[in-house]
Amino acid sequence: EDAFVGPSLGAEAINQGYLSMALGLLLVIVFMIGYYGTPGWMANLALFFNVFFIAGVLVQIQAALTLPGIAGIVLTLGMAVDANVLINERIREELHKGKGLLDAINIGYEKALSAILDGNITTVLIGVILIIFGSGSVKGFGVTLCIGLVTSVFTSVYISHILIDWMAKRQIKAG
């Protein structure tokens, strides 16, 4: 039995995908701020940089965003949030051990790095396999997944570190 999805149903599915991504992002923002406070704000800012970088790369390669592409972006944003949770929990552990704020931040990032890289590298490998052996929408999912993972690692490990360091130095300077 063949099924045909017309253009209006496809457009509706894409719009629902955008809506679910926006709603999910809003819930993540609320959680990160509510649970982590100021570091949650910094993680959210890094997440917005991530979305900006993903969109920029997709525009540069002239990729059409499909439902599987949206799913790939949502998955990578989830992994970016996970990376920020790992980092923030490591920082908390170091603060509970009595480390100073800047030391706790640097050690927290250092300790979280291997777990973040392991998870993202293995998922990029899966994305590459999907790109090589997949066709159509599977390949599109793999492309957005790989792009999103690269930008997620960059924003989670580098951009958020800069932002949290900046926030900590302002906090220390303010007394």
Task: Please provide the spans of the model-predicted regions.
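Interfacial segments of transmembrane alpha-helices in multi-pass membrane proteins
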Residues: 11-68, 132-137
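Hydrophobic alpha-helical transmembrane segments of membrane transport and translocation systems
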Residues: 56-57, 93-175
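Membrane-embedded alpha-helices of multi-pass transport/permease systems
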Residues: 81-84, 88-91, 161
